[in-house]
Regions:
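A short, Lys/Arg-rich alpha-helix, primarily the initiator
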Residues: 1-27
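Short, charged recognition helix plus adjacent turn
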Residues: 2-9, 70, 78-85
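Short alpha-helical elements of helix-turn-helix
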Residues: 16, 32, 48, 62-66
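Generic non-transmembrane alpha-helical segments
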Residues: 17, 21, 33, 37-41, ...
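Short alpha-helical DNA-recognition segment
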Residues: 27-52
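DNA major-groove recognition helix of helix-turn-helix/homeodomain DNA-binding modules
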Residues: 37, 61-78
Length: 85
């Protein structure tokens, strides 16, 4: 069965960006804190789901992407930008 993958082979494009943005925030934001903020937006994610998203092991829905953009105070473009080396 074919599964859609990002060029990097991960299940999402936004995971690396979510991790980078979260780690750049001041004060630093933990995965647990981010999960709590997402729950306040009505998105039921726990710390483990955040970890799987950031590592690219889990898909991200458009509803979740919208909430991530709001919680992290960034644009959709910031979350979907593909990193080039």
């Amino acid at each position: 069965m074919y599964k859609n993958k990002a060029k990097s082979g991960t299940n999402n494009i936004s995971g690396n960006n979510i991790a980078r943005i979260r780690k750049e925030m001041y004060p630093k934001v933990s995965q647990r804190f981010l999960a709590d903020k997402m729950q306040l937006e009505g998105i039921e994610l726990d710390k483990n789901a955040i970890q799987r998203i950031e590592s690219g092991a889990r898909f991200v829905t458009d509803i979740e992407l919208k909430a991530f953009a709001k919680v992290l105070d960034v644009s959709y473009e910031d979350l979907l930008a593909e990193q080039t080396l």
